[in-house]
C-alpha cells in the first residue's frame, strides 16, 4: 500500500527496530532504515517482515512490522539524502557518540528539500538534549543562507525515551523482544508557527522536556546502572538477581532516593509522584521476565561516568545544592571497577586511563569535573581507592 507519511530512521539496532520503528509503523509511516552495518541492512532488505514481542508481568503481545525499506549509508549516501529530503520525519537511535557521523546526510537533505513544510528532526538517545547536539553537527554543515531560513526547512525537537530492550535471544535475527512499558516524550514548542508535528501514536508532547529527561535519566538509568555495576562486582549475571539481594536492593533504592530529592526540589514534582515513579521503575528493572544481563546494562562505562550522565549529572547538582550524594558516589566507584569486560571497548579504555593518569586527571578527563567543584575532591578520593586496589 502506498504510504502518505515517511520516516527515515538512522540505526537498525534493537531500539530502532523494536521501539522507534514500531511506533512509526503503527502510526501509518513508511519507515526507511539507514545503517552502516552490512549484516543488518542486508537482513532488512532480504526480509519483508519482522516481529516485535512486548513482554510484561501479564504475558506477551506480538506485532508484525512490514512496509519498510533499508539503505546502507556507507555506499548509497545519495539515496539516503534523497529519502530524507522527501520525508516527514528523521529520527535516530545510534548512540550519542555517533550523532556527529549522521549529521552530513541530514544537512545535505535539508539543503535539497523542496517540500513546503519543514522536516521534523528527533534524536531518540539516552542523553540530555540529544537533538540539540545533533542539530549543532547538522548546522555546522549548512550554508549560511539555509541556516538563516532553517525554520522553513527543519524543526528540531528534543525527546526523552524510556523502554528496556533486554539482551536478545540467540538467533533472534531481526525480531526484537522488548518490555511493554514505554514512554516517548517530545517537546512541542519547535513545531509551533508552521511546523508539522509528527502524528505518532504513543508520543507524549510536552512544553518543557527537562523534567521528563532528568526524571528518566536520573531514575531509570541511575537505578539500572547502579544495579549493573554492583552486580558485576558481586559476580551476579542478571539485574533481577541483583535486586533479589536485600543489601544491593537497598543500595539501588538509596541511589534513587538521592536523585528523587533533586527531581522534587528542582522541578517541583511532588514527593508522592516521584516516589510512585521510583516504585514503578524498581518493579520494572526487577522483572525476571526481562532476563536483563548485568554486563549489557553496564557496558560503555566511560559514557556513563561522563559529566551529564546518570551518576555525575545528579551528583554534581546535589553537591552544588549542599545535598547528600553518598550512594551515587558508591555507584561511581563500582562503575570505575567495570574494567576489561569482554566485548566492551570502553571498559578496556577505562582500565588504560586509570593506569596512565593521576586521580585528578582521571576526574577531569572521565567525569568532566574541574578542580574547585564541590564534587572534585570526593571523586579524586574514589579514583585513588580504585587505582590502589
Curated annotation (Swiss-Prot):
Pfam families: Mannitol_dh, Mannitol_dh_C
Residues bound to NAD(+): 7-18
GO MF annotation list: mannitol-1-phosphate 5-dehydrogenase activity
EC category: oxidoreductase
Entry superkingdom: Eukaryota
GO BP term, example: mannitol catabolic process
Tagged with keyword NAD: yes
GO cellular component term, pick one: cytosol
Reactions accelerated catalytically: D-mannitol 1-phosphate + NAD(+) = beta-D-fructose 6-phosphate + NADH + H(+)
Active site per UniProt: 216
InterPro entries on file: 6-PGluconate_DH-like_C_sf, 6PGD_dom2, Mannitol_1_phos_5_DH, Mannitol_DH, Mannitol_DH_C, Mannitol_DH_N, NAD(P)-bd_dom_sf
Sorted UniProt keywords: NAD, Oxidoreductase
E.C. number: 1.1.1.17
Function: Catalyzes the NAD(H)-dependent interconversion of D-fructose 6-phosphate and D-mannitol 1-phosphate in the mannitol metabolic pathway.
Quaternary structure, from the entry: Monomer.
Protein family: Belongs to the mannitol dehydrogenase family.
Protein name per its UniProtKB record: Mannitol-1-phosphate 5-dehydrogenase
